[in-house]
Amino acid sequence: MFLDTNVIVDIFRFDEESKNFQKIFELIRDAPLYISVFQIGEISDWSLTNKVDPIEPIGFLKKTMNIIPLTEDICLEGSKIKYEMRNKGEKNFSLADGIILASARSINQTLISKDGDFKQAKDVIMV
């Protein structure tokens, strides 16, 4: 399973009572987990914004996730995905969203996300 950054943030917040957290946990419990190297920057940004030293959450990601490198092919595919999603009416679909989805597709993984911009993508599980 490939995790979107908003799902990673939910994991860091770790509220066992949350139905959303329980759903995420059920989906990823025994699956190998993947993220894009790009998301390390997003998590660092989230950490700094929330006055958390980014070293700990990034260390956790490095220990528990398979980190997919950013390649030229993924970048090009990400921009193509952004273009296609915007043409489908997803006006807020970003290049970052496209790169994350392209990274998941590059290794034949399903993306798990809370981001409504992905609702029209066939290979995304919305939580």
Which ranges hold each PLM region?
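Short, well-structured N-terminal submotif of metal-dependent ribonuclease cores
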Residues: 1-35, 45-59
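Short, well-ordered coil/turn elements that cap or connect secondary structure elements
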Residues: 28-30, 62, 106, 121
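Short linear capping/connector segments at secondary-structure termini
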Residues: 40, 59-64
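A generic structural signal for short hydrophobic patches within well-formed alpha-helices
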Residues: 8-9, 40-43, 75, 118-119
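Active-site regions of enzymes building and remodeling cell-envelope glycoconjugates
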Residues: 65-66, 122-127
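Short loop->beta-strand "edge-of-pocket" segments that line small-molecule binding or catalytic clefts
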Residues: 32-34, 63-69
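Active-site neighborhoods of divalent-metal-dependent phosphate/nucleic-acid chemistry enzymes
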Residues: 66-112
